[in-house]
């Protein structure tokens, strides 16, 4: 662990966005004694929007380093069993979540996004650094500093501006404006929408047991539930849209749209005799949103850098959005802490070098996570004949291989490198260390599929 009291270089960081990404970075910087402010455009840090998020071991270990994991853990129960249902009535169960916890020391959990933000805010040691009602209108950059201008006329000065302001990022828009000609057409059209999602939270439903997780797959649709503390049900319904939209020309949805979707699919089975109508009937909150997907190539320009959903946006199917944002924050903070304890200056060249290293350390892993989420959404909604086959006949028969690939993906996660590794970390971190990044299933998986396909065809032909 580095001695943060030996700071030689004063760094000032302006974080735009009081999101999970932004507040996690703020916690990291506070631990490193690096000066920073958080600018949030909304009037409150933790509004109730009906959304929830999953915390996997790769995110949980970082939150544990920051001293907030115990509070998060008290709000939920570990997921120990996964249940999967297909439209033909076939179903199977897996202990993958329990095995993941045994290997890595942290469970898979789900809880309200509002509660996560509330805990991150409540446990943050310098609340005077957080400013609400601060909508960014302009970013200025010079050789000596960056300036962020907000709609109330305030000007914030720093060495670095971090865009943690989500998919509709004002920081990204300013970066693109200033880097015109350097940001390619690909990045300008990187985010697209093929799916919409209804998120909801419901009161307990008999038959959906705490600690279990259900995946119900249909053609063009999937229903996924997580059953938390006191039986609360966190759920989402992923729907394939009739066309592909390119951001920012994407659809918007209202509460009435969510109601219409749940009415249309009311009879879709979830598990046993439970259907979508039961989730909707017991809801305490629900909302509907378009799901942007995309990964940018350009993450930084001079003194501006992006993290979280502002650069990589994925569907919720593999539950890695918040975890990947926490990883971003851990890596960026670790590099800034290293700079703060060096004798280097904070010229544009020095800052640019740090940001380039951040991108170099993160891009490959983020890309693999994005690919897995992209594949997962299409597998779960049975997007084509191959994915129908792989989901129905391959994954149920290769559960151990799925666990191994999941373990490899988790083990590659970074830490806040100037903070101690939590004692509860399991042996899986070292057992699977050095594994190659795990993306979507590719040729080897398809080769494995061939003998199974042959046996299925023989059964259909001669049974």
UniProtKB/Swiss-Prot annotation:
Record function comment: FAD-dependent monooxygenase; part of the gene cluster that mediates the biosynthesis of calidodehydroaustin, a fungal meroterpenoid. The first step of the pathway is the synthesis of 3,5-dimethylorsellinic acid by the polyketide synthase ausA. 3,5-dimethylorsellinic acid is then prenylated by the polyprenyl transferase ausN. Further epoxidation by the FAD-dependent monooxygenase ausM and cyclization by the probable terpene cyclase ausL lead to the formation of protoaustinoid A.
Known EC number: 1.-.-.-
SUPFAM superfamilies assigned: FAD/NAD(P)-binding domain
Major site of localization recorded for this protein: membrane
The name this protein goes by in its record: FAD-dependent monooxygenase ausM
Residues of the signal peptide: none
Cofactor: FAD
Binding residue positions for FAD: 40, 54, 113, 309, 322
Annotated TM spans: 443-463
GO molecular function: FAD binding; monooxygenase activity
Subcellular location field: Membrane
Other facts: In A.calidoustus, the austinoid gene cluster lies on a contiguous DNA region, while clusters from E.nidulans and P.brasilianum are split in their respective genomes. Genetic rearrangements provoked variability among the clusters and E.nidulans produces the least number of austionoid derivatives with the end products austinol and dehydroaustinol, while P.brasilianum can produce until acetoxydehydroaustin, and A.calidoustus produces the highest number of identified derivatives.
InterPro entries from the UniProt entry: FAD-bd (IPR002938), FAD/NAD-bd_sf (IPR036188), FAD_mOase_fung (IPR050562)
Pathway recorded for this protein: Secondary metabolite biosynthesis; terpenoid biosynthesis
Keyword NADP: no
UniProt record similarity statement: Belongs to the paxM FAD-dependent monooxygenase family.
UniProt gene name: ausM
Pfam families registered for this protein in UniProt: FAD_binding_3
GO biological process, one term: terpenoid biosynthetic process
GO CC annotation terms, alphabetical: membrane
Topology versus the membrane: Single-pass membrane protein
Disulfide bonds: none
Active site: 217
UniProt keyword list: FAD, Flavoprotein, Membrane, Monooxygenase, Oxidoreductase, Transmembrane, Transmembrane helix
The keyword ATP-binding appears for this protein: no
